[in-house]
């Protein structure tokens, strides 16, 4: 089992944790339906970049 040789300082611990923060989801409004969706993803009704790509 690995054990550290020296104690990590508060600064080094904080620098390591600086990448752990969560970011909010990037949402876009569809041009045709006006529906909110995740960026680079198909909307719930099957539109992507203004075109119907999924037929249900």
Curated annotation (Swiss-Prot):
Region (Disordered): 1-26
Gene Ontology terms describing biological process: translation
GO molecular function, one term: structural constituent of ribosome
Composition skew (Basic residues), residue ranges: 7-16
Keywords: Ribonucleoprotein, Ribosomal protein
Domain of life: Bacteria
Pfam family, one: Ribosomal_L32p
One cellular component term from this protein's GO annotations in UniProt: large ribosomal subunit
Family: Belongs to the bacterial ribosomal protein bL32 family.
HAMAP family: Ribosomal_bL32
Protein name: Large ribosomal subunit protein bL32
Organism: Shewanella amazonensis (strain ATCC BAA-1098 / SB2B)
Taxonomic path: Bacteria, Pseudomonadati, Pseudomonadota, Gammaproteobacteria, Alteromonadales
